[in-house]
Amino acid sequence: MKVLIVFYSMYGHIYRMAEAVAEGVRSVDGAEAVLRRVPETLSAEILASMGATEAQKQFAHIPVCTVDELGAADAVIFGTPTRFGNMAGQMRQFLDATGRLWVSGALVGKAGSVFTSSNTQHGGQESTILSFHINLLHQGMVIVGLPYSFQGQSTMDEITGGSPYGASTIAGPTGARTPSDNELAGARYQGRHVAEIARKLTRN
Ligand SMILES: Cc1cc2nc3c(=O)[nH]c(=O)nc-3n(C[C@H](O)[C@H](O)[C@H](O)COP(=O)(O)O)c2cc1C
């Protein structure tokens, strides 16, 4: 059973979370985690002006996802930073290339799940995940979130990402904060949870 983790990251937070999601997937017997990134759509000049050039080198070795790989996966977990409370345009562009999967119903009945990051605590993590879910529903996917059985999302001991909609991390106003242990635990939990549900959905 193949669980595809397809992400966009500009500064590395979503990449780090994607690695943790993959760990969670791999903790399920028979589940293979495949990490892919979506194509970059901004020019090198714009990326340099945004201070992304060095950061993106950390995950340049991850292969770029193809639409066929998306269609062939047993479950898909999407990771995107928030952009004004929505998914990043790079992810949007990738989704807009999947029309033929919609036509053929390739994703119907497969588990789909979303995780995110933002600079500020209330900067749109929930709206990013929930508006992403609309796309999954149009593709006929079965939406999987991050249940409250992941107790780390209820903690009052620290400022943390994570909601019933999906794992998340807060990068901080300058983007210098890295995903906390609790946020990474949420990402691992989500990966494991999706893989467990996908295993049930794919059982004959
Ligand atoms: C154009 C743009 C819009 C953004 N919009 C938001 C926003 O609405 N709320 C917020 O908290 N952070 C916002 N951010 C910050 C990003 O979400 C943050 O850089 C990202 O989550 C870090 O993830 P990454 O390291 O994987 O790129 C924005 C960043 C950019 C470049």
UniProtKB/Swiss-Prot annotation:
Pfam families: FMN_red. Residues 3-194 form the Flavodoxin-like domain. It is an enzyme of class 1 (oxidoreductase). One of its GO terms (cellular component) is membrane. Its cofactor is FMN. This is NAD(P)H dehydrogenase (quinone). HAMAP family: NQOR (MF_01017). NAD(+) binds at residue 11. Its EC number is 1.6.5.2. One of its GO terms (molecular function) is NADH:ubiquinone reductase (non-electrogenic) activity. It comes from the Bacteria. Belongs to the WrbA family. It catalyses: a quinone + NADH + H(+) = a quinol + NAD(+); a quinone + NADPH + H(+) = a quinol + NADP(+). FMN binds at residues 9-14, 82-84, 138. InterPro entries: Flavodoxin/NO_synth, Flavoprotein-like_sf, Flavoprotein_WrbA-like, FMN_Rdtase-like_dom, NQO. Keywords: Flavoprotein, FMN, NAD, NADP, Nucleotide-binding, Oxidoreductase. It comes from Syntrophobacter fumaroxidans (strain DSM 10017 / MPOB). The keyword Oxidoreductase applies. Substrate binds at residue 102. Binds 1 FMN per monomer.
